[in-house]
Amino acid sequence: LRFPKMPSYLRRAAIQHALGSISSYKTRLELWEKTDQKGGRPKLVCDNHAMPVFYRDVMYREDTEEKDGACLKLYDGHDWKWFRVSLSHTDMEYLRKNWAGKKAAAPVLEKRHRKYFLRFSYTEEVPLTKTPVKEQIICSVDLGLNTDAVCTIMRSDGTVLGRKFIDFPSEKDRMYRVLGRISRFQRKHGSAQVKSRWAYAKRLNTELGRKIAGAVTGYAEENHADVIVFEYLETKGKISGRKKQKLHLWRKRDIQKRCEHQAHRRGMRISRICAWNTSRLAYDGSGTVVRDPGNHSLCTFQNGKRYNCDLSASYNIGARYFIRELLKPLPVTERSLLEAKVPSVKRRISCVYADLRELFSEMELLRAA
């Protein structure tokens, strides 16, 4: 194939992208062959939708005459020429306000929803907090279906400094209303002409995930948290039952990934704990809870106490993090002594908030002795 007057830097970028795709395919194929799996063989995908990079000085220049403009080198069908384009004023103000002085990479062309955009990337080095475990303040987060997120600010001794219920009911109502329209349309006309409606519902769900992640990170920063603790929700499997659509739309991994990016930029760390029995076990150690049949957010403990199930789970999430971090650096003899006095901390899937309070008390007594 001949590419008339194609710049050498664009040609090199295309060649490197192709080599990277081939190398990735070979690596994935070797790993697949080692596992002896019958299905899921990697495929060499040719349509990678690679977009060109506008290298600075040779393809991209900032416009000296217009504050919110730029000059791009484009091919007009005959020759490569410089064209002046106007950029969004609000976007450029955001970049000038938040990313001035940071190391900027070359902008990349991006196509979304049949429109083209310039994606600007910046590099920033942020030191993460190194606060000792006993001095840490954490924000334990329970992501749920009924309430979007329940956050608890906690110290290592179990002291609760703050609690917050994060929910966006109007956004969820809007999305479910769109899903209802899709369902009614599909019953009448089939599923052939609802692609745009599903795309709209997906965008609403993505925006909901952004708002939840921003609210969680903002609350953690407001309370000077060192670590944001989540449940490990990377499990995969077939989903069935009445709540199948709700579970498919639940963007738990996307929310955690967005929180991780935002927290790292603010200097906070992210940690995950085992999710087993965090909601099933009561935080006070009384045993399993019984959820209300009409309102799954509320539950009854074995001792008759009525409580919010998601709030109890957020206590247990924070407790499991501190139990793990407090026991990890101890010598084996000291750890065995503490586990003998608090047997429930041996199995992490059965640890609750009451076990953290008891463990911390035993550690203080052992240190005093």
What are these regions (language model features)?
Residues L1-A369:
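Nucleic-acid substrate recognition interfaces
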